[in-house]
Structures are given as structure tokens and as C-alpha cells.
């Protein structure tokens, strides 16, 4: 929504409509993706999990099932996060991520060859004023974030880091958070803008709607199926900033 208002003198009577509101629309193009995995409990024989393997019929329980499934879900979450930022719909199992959506449509900032701090300042100053709100953030990869932290420590700016384990910190002199996101790992990109400018679309009540784990008597194996639809979109790409680090 683009809103333009005009304040008028109200000394007299009457009604003089001025200003406008324009509704813009950008479509989310979700992609249906899935994960299918299969487990044969006999393959666990000879491993640390073998003592829980029950071969007898009617004992269809996968040893350490909770740990197996929990690890799969963690990896699915990591893969989705990376795709949210770096995905390309031309790649199987991926949808266009934020970087792809912003390609050629966002503002750009220049990397400073001598200082990560100066690079972040360049990103901040490249933001249009309309994008500098309470929910504005600068998103960086873990490798950039950690290098910036070390640079600040070398400058004896310990006071800006309230918690050594924090994943975000205010950019000095601004109200903008610098946030470390794993989804940007290896991208050599920095993204800045309002959080409310980015939208994620899923198919039903959550982002992993179909989740089935069962024992197949036909093949005598355990099977896992996860299927969901996911997509991202940016309402106003020209209010975002992308900085390339290479």
C-alpha cells in the first residue's frame, strides 16, 4: 500500500479531498517440495543402536526413533532457511528466495575493502528513509557477523556487545539491528530492510503440513514422508538494500 497525504487548512467549512492510497500487488509463487526417507532396522545391527533392534514380527519400532526424526527435522529447517534466502526455483526442491526476488530490483550498497563496519554503514546509508523504521534490520551471514565482531573488539568497542552469544546487535549510532542468519551462509551478500516488507507463504496451518512416519509391512522398512508448500515475496523491493561482498 502506497499512501500520500496532504494536510490542509481547516479554517473554513467544506470538504476538499486530497491525497491518495494505491494498492500494489506482488504474488507469492510457492513450490511444493518433499522429503522421502527409508530406514531398514537391520542396517542398525553392528552400530551403537543395535541393542534396541527388535527383529521379531510385531516389534515394528525403530530404535531411537525420536532422535532420528528430530535430526531430520533440524536438517529440514536448515535447508528451508537457506532456501528462503538463497533458493532458485530452477533448482529441484527449491523456490525463489529473497536474494533471487531482489535481484535487479533492490537498492545496492558498496563493500568497503578495509572495514566490515564501514560496509555496514554503507548498507545503512543506502536504505531509503521510508525503510528506516522500528522493524528495520541488516541481515548478514555468520562468517561476516563474526568477522565484524572481532573488528569491533580490536577497536576496543566492547560496550556494544551486551551478550557474547547474541545473534544480533545494534549498529552503533543507529536503531537498526544487525542480525546473523544461517540462511545467508556462503552467499557473500548482505540484505537490509524492514522485516514487515518480507512475506512467507505456506500451504495450510504451518510450513510442514504433511508429516508421516510409518512401518511398511510390504517392504518391512520404516518410511518418512514430509511434504509442504513454501514461497517468499518482498512487497517493495526498492525499499530493500543488497550488498555484494565479492
Task: State where each predicted segment sits.
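Alpha-helical scaffold segments that mediate packing/assembly in large oligomeric complexes
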Residues: 48-126, 245-246
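Residues at beta-strand starts and edge strands
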Residues: 31-33, 66, 134, 220-222
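Short loop/turn segments at secondary-structure transitions that flank enzyme active sites
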Residues: 43, 78, 104, 144-146, ...
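Assembly/oligomerization interface modules of large self-assembling protein complexes
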Residues: 1-49
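Helix N-cap / beta->alpha transition motif
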Residues: 38-47, 140-144, 193-194, 236
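Short coil/turn segments at secondary-structure boundaries
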Residues: 84-89, 136-141, 161, 165
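Ordered core of a single globular domain
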Residues: 118-155
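Sequence/fold signature of self-assembling virion shell proteins
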Residues: 1-4, 96, 100-115, 150-246
Amino acid at each position: 500500500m502506497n499512501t500520500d497525504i496532504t494536510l490542509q487548512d481547516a479554517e473554513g467549512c467544506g470538504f476538499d479531498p486530497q491525497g491518495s492510497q494505491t494498492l500494489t500487488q506482488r504474488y507469492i509463487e510457492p513450490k511444493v517440495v518433499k522429503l522421502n526417507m527409508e530406514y531398514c532396522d537391520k542396517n542398525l545391527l553392528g552400530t551403537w543402536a543395535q541393542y534396541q533392534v527388535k527383529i521379531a514380527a510385531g516389534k515394528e519400532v525403530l530404535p531411537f526413533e525420536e532422535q532420528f526424526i528430530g535430526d531430520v527435522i533440524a536438517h529440514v529447517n536448515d535447508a528451508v532457511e537457506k532456501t528462503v534466502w538463497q533458493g532458485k526455483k530452477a533448482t529441484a526442491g527449491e523456490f525463489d528466495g529473497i536474494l533471487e526476488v531482489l535481484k535487479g530490483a533492490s537498492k545496492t550498497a558498496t563493500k568497503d575493502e578495509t572495514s566490515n563496519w564501514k560496509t555496514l554503514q554503507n548498507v545503512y546509508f543506502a536504505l531509503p528513509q521510508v525503510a528506516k523504521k522500528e522493524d528495520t534490520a541488516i541481515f548478514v551471514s555468520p562468517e561476516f557477523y563474526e568477522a565484524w565482531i572481532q573488528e569491533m573488539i580490536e577497536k576496543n568497542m566492547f560496550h556494544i556487545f551486551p551478550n557474547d552469544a547474541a545473534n544480533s546487535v545494534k549498529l552503533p549510532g543507529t536503531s537498526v539491528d544487525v542480525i546473523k542468519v544461517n540462511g545467508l551462509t556462503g552467499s557473500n551478500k548482505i540484505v537490509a530492510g524492514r522485516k514487515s516488507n518480507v512475506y512467507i507463504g505456506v500451504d495450510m496451518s504451518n510450513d510442514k503440513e504433511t508429516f508421516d512416519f510409518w512401518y511398511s509391512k510390504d517392504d518391512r522398512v520404516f518410511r518418512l514422508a514430509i511434504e509442504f508448500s513454501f514461497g517468499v515475496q518482498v512487497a517493495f523491493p526498492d525499499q530493500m538494500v543488497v550488498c555484494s561482498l565479492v
